[in-house]
């Protein structure tokens, strides 16, 4: 549920206008209530996928709901889902892609500060999280602020996982982390 919902793409390129994000019947209560009625004990929201579009009004990018027509850019999908999870007493988790096909600095050292700032926002502003999910992210082709090029990284070293994971441990000590780099749950290659 992101700009891709409105562009009919599996993965966005990062050049999608926030203006395409215009859900007309979004109802966090209905989504979480349905999950709870189905017997689920937790829900993980994809807060930002590889296209870089943020479902919360991040202070660090313009590529987010704050520049969409949805509720005049004044609302926050992450907050609504988080609040509904609290109401229905089911765990709330976040998915944050390390790869960002929209950001001009992706693949360079400066991007890490941006990524960690977003991780800090998500791990401090939405209550207790039961899981933080980092997808595998090797880079690839993308918009990258208009560069429209291929960028590859060494996923084992680029994200400096030891220090990045420390943000989660400090802000959400009880959260389980999923990523290719561990430490709690790793991808086993069966997607």
What positions do the PLM features span?
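Mature catalytic domains of secreted/periplasmic carbohydrate-active enzymes
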Residues: 1-191
């Amino acid at each position: 549920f992101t700009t891709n919902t409105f562009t009919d793409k599996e993965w966005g390129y990062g050049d999608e206008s926030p203006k395409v994000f215009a859900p007309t019947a979004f109802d966090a209560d209905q989504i979480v209530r349905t999950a709870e009625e189905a017997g689920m004990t937790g829900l993980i929201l994809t807060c930002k996928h590889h296209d870089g579009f943020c479902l919360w009004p991040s202070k660090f990018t313009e590529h987010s709901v704050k520049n969409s027509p949805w509720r005049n850019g004044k609302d926050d999908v992450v907050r609504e889902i988080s609040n509904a999870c609290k109401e229905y007493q089911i765990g709330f988790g976040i998915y944050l892609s390390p790869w960002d096909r929209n950001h001009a600095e992706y693949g360079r050292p400066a991007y890490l500060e941006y990524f960690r700032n977003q991780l800090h926002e998500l791990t401090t502003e939405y209550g207790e999280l039961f899981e933080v999910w980092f997808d595998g992210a090797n880079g690839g082709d993308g918009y990258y602020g208009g560069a429209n090029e291929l960028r590859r990284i060494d996923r084992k070293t680029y994200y400096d996982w030891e220090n990045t994971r420390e943000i989660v441990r400090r802000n959400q000590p009880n959260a389980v982390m999923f990523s290719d780099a561990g430490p709690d749950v790793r991808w086993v290659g069966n997607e």
